[in-house]
Amino acid sequence: MQLAKPNSLTIEDFHEVSPGFCTRIHVQMRRYVYRIAVARSQEIYEAMRTEPSTVCFSERDYAWFLPPGLDLYKMQKACELFHGTHVVGSFFLHRDRDKRKEQRRGEYVKAIRYIEHCGVSKGEAYAFDNDLYDYYNVSVYSRSFVREQIRRMMGAIIAHGYDRIPLSLIKWLLANPISDNFWGLRLRVAPPYGLHLVDVSYDPVDFVNPNPYVDNKVIVVGEDGTMKERLEKNLDAEKEERELDENDEEDGDGDELLENDRRIVGSSQR
């Protein structure tokens, strides 16, 4: 990354951790932000396709461009429906090949997720200020997500913001957690380039006393000075790690839920 874009990566802090600590399994909270750019007029929105401005190029990989008319109040009402614990099967890209794999193993992915917070806030331009678009952030806090969950949530939230679907339809999707229901209603999955992982939080106790203890790969130096890689299997941790791998998507949201009363939420959206 530093070669492609110098000075784009900095180390702000580091911690010494136990050999049994896992950066994925021991996560307490993840904070994702989905950025949207709403055109201030229909002319500006249509010109994006025929005569794109410098703003369009600067935001191309960082926000979802939308036409004017988005109702923020309705968006917020849709966001609030996701608070709490839900079976989010309707917002889960559950592919047939994954279902067959689960059937062979006799292990099935859980789609129960706890959403700490989902809400809309004022955003800002990525590169430079302009008078063409209004920027907004949809922030979602949870320990873990299923594949495509946030992008499907955003598709439903935006659809209600444009008054294309009623709130009752989102409630129905939450009450009828089947993956095919989302496509059956012809809802659009939000594009991936607006989604950003902003913060990952851990309980400092897990740095030194991780629970569960994960047997990571360890480099052992022998008496003759040779180095060997050792991996001792922890079956419970290995099973959970496998479930995490099978539910990851390109943006990294797909970890198995572990109920824990200690929830550490990252700093508020800047």
List PLM regions with ranges:
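Structured-RNA-binding interfaces characteristic of tRNA pseudouridine synthases
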Residues: 1-270
